[in-house]
Amino acid sequence: MKQQARRLLNKNEKGLLPREVYVLSVVAFFVALGYGMIIPAIPLFAKTFQVNNAQIGAIISAFALARFAMGLPAGKLIDLFGERRVQTTGLLIVAISTFASGLANSYWQLLTYRALGGIGSVMFSVSASSLLMRSVDDSIRGRAQSTFNGGFLIGAIAGPAVGGILSVISLRVPFFVYAFTLVCAAFVTSFFLSTKRLGKSIKNKQDPSDRILLAEALKSYPYVAAMAISFLSNWVLFGLRNSILPLFAKEHLGASNSALGLGFTIAAIVQGIALVYVGKISDFRGRRFALMIGSFTLLSGVATIIISSHWWYYFVAMVFFGIGGAFEGTAASSVVGDLFGGKGGRVIALFQMAGDFGNIISPVLLGWLVDAHSYRPAFIATAAVFSLTLLLSAKMPETRKLNK
């Protein structure tokens, strides 16, 4: 039985992915590389306008809120004009707004341009996910998603290092270089994803008769569960790991600034290594199995922090977070791809919005819990809420189809 499943799921014995997957992964690399460049520069550049920390935080939030608010409209645009046009347009919007950010002469200009960048960003991310889902079948979907996520991860690792070097020249330079990488990404999209290059195996626009309506998608338990898992995973990875864990590790575990940075590097490297195998596991063992591994691993990371008493617990937790993030990100997206095959821009957009909402709300709520009750109660509350993902995963029917 296992041999039959393996043969059906791996019709292409070499596991070769279609060209679209590699092109989208290159585009993801350019986007993440440039975004990583400006991450260390944004707060420093904003500070030059003599603003307070809350106003600096508003610049970060404006980008995220614009992404969230424009998610469903971006999905509608994809339904009307197709992924390739929307992706190219979105990348150019981010490129122009980023270049303008580098030229900003006031705080309000910078805030406005970053918000516009969020609109273009969600146009890119939703269209890329939709095209990726439509380009592959269930037999290789996990590997395709891992490859795409890997492009993002490599860019995200390299970006801050490059941005730090560029910031020495000027805090405006990273914005200009990021704009250039986005133009490169737009060129790759428009040229290498054109019908002339790829043929007509994937239509530029979806057939309206095949499109999945949002109301119909919301009746699917696996879809709703995948959204909940994405929300809760981002709660852990962005709210806990990225926001309050570094403060806890420094104040209570005695970790140095260099140790904090090393922890994030370790998590990124571990996640990159895990992505090599996660896609195959998801394809051969199923999405439900991969989601359960991811949920258990992330929960183990939170538990490690709860019982921590020394700085090395921080590194152990970051390893768990790297592995768990690879499983959850790949498997949850694969579930949505299995169910709908990218047929419905707003369906894909709402799934991404669930993750974005976790990014937005979790740092605020966890920060409030820390202020009101201290760190460990915030960690325990996170573990209690996130444990729901184990139940959601266990109840989820397998969405990967053996008869593709």
Predicted regions, residues:
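Juxtamembrane intracellular "pre-TM" segments in multi-pass secondary transporters
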Residues: 4-18, 195-226
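Short amphipathic helix-loop junctions that connect adjacent transmembrane helices
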Residues: 41-53, 243-258
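Helix-breaking motifs and short loop linkers at transmembrane-helix boundaries and internal kinks
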Residues: 50, 82, 103-109, 254, ...
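Residue-level signature of mid-helix packing/kink "hotspots" within the transmembrane helices
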Residues: 64-72, 156-157, 268-276, 359-360
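Conserved MFS/SLC helix-loop-helix module at the cytosolic interface between two early adjacent transmembrane helices
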Residues: 69-105, 282-288
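Paired small-residue
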Residues: 97, 108-116, 301, 312-320
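Cytoplasmic helix-loop-helix junction between adjacent transmembrane helices
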Residues: 113-154, 339-341
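Helix-loop-helix hairpin linking two adjacent transmembrane segments in secondary transporters
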Residues: 148-190
